[in-house]
């Protein structure tokens, strides 16, 4: 449990950074798809 408490915040921080980076890159190449959904 101690190992989980130390790895969970690190993993979530990396995950949110990757997700934000993907969203920013997707928004840069396809700006209309993100704000005007089907």
Curated annotation (Swiss-Prot):
The chain crosses the membrane at residues 4-24. It is a single-pass membrane protein. InterPro entries: PSI_PsaJ, PSI_PsaJ_sf. SUPFAM superfamilies: Subunit IX of photosystem I reaction centre, PsaJ. It comes from the Eukaryota. Keywords: Membrane, Organellar chromatophore, Photosynthesis, Photosystem I, Plastid, Thylakoid, Transmembrane, Transmembrane helix. It is found in: Plastid, Organellar chromatophore thylakoid membrane. It holds the Pfam family PSI_PsaJ. GO terms for biological process: photosynthesis. One of its GO terms (cellular component) is plastid. May help in the organization of the PsaE and PsaF subunits. Belongs to the PsaJ family. HAMAP family: PSI_PsaJ. PANTHER family: PHOTOSYSTEM I REACTION CENTER SUBUNIT IX, PTHR36082. This is Photosystem I reaction center subunit IX. It comes from Paulinella chromatophora.
């Amino acid at each position: 449990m101690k190992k989980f408490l130390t790895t969970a915040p690190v993993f979530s921080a990396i995950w949110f950074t990757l997700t934000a980076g993907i969203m920013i890159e997707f928004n840069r190449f396809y700006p209309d798809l993100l704000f005007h959904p089907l």
